[in-house]
């Protein structure tokens, strides 16, 4: 039997991973144990097992067809995990590149993953900008509030297209400054 597959997305700096991890910890205490999987890590595991990459940076240098195959295999592995327990997949709905927005979950991944719910974690663009500026542990491209808002709009559009292709519901969770507990509670209500 397939358990729930939930995809959690958000722009860099929105706090999606933090909100998800806190929700997972509380749900685990309640006896609901999700397996949390980062999609990029799942891809790296496949590439590493095949001897194609020994670090994540090397994956970007693989030819597009190999990358697509690795994406598909990672989606299949995550779907297999869902036979054992519910799975929360931490990934990006879209990736902003110099040539435009790249879908984080192209059709060949969605077919394998078949998510039940797609969650988009958001907040105001100026809050994200301030979080990015204060986070010295990460090297992120400097963006304007307007470009962050555009990226969030594209994430919503991509999430809805993922829903159209799979029948998944799409939920927007707001992670406002100082109100992370509200975001965690909202996320948990969907995950239960």
Swiss-Prot record:
Location(s), subcellular = Cytoplasm
Residues annotated as binding ATP are 10-18
**UniProt KW Secreted keyword:** no
Entry's Gene Ontology molecular function annotations: adenylate kinase activity; ATP binding
GO CC terms: cytoplasm
Q: Which reactions does this protein catalyse?
A: AMP + ATP = 2 ADP
Q: What are the UniProt keywords, alphabetically?
A: ATP-binding, Cytoplasm, Kinase, Nucleotide-binding, Transferase
- Predominant place of localization: cytoplasm
Q: What is its EC number?
A: 2.7.4.3
Q: What class of enzyme is it?
A: transferase
Q: How does it assemble?
A: Monomer.
The family note in this entry says: Belongs to the archaeal adenylate kinase family.
Q: What is this protein called?
A: Adenylate kinase
Q: What organism is recorded for this protein?
A: Methanococcus maripaludis (strain DSM 14266 / JCM 13030 / NBRC 101832 / S2 / LL)
The organism's lineage is: Archaea, Methanobacteriati, Methanobacteriota, Methanomada group, Methanococci
Q: Which gene encodes it?
A: adkA
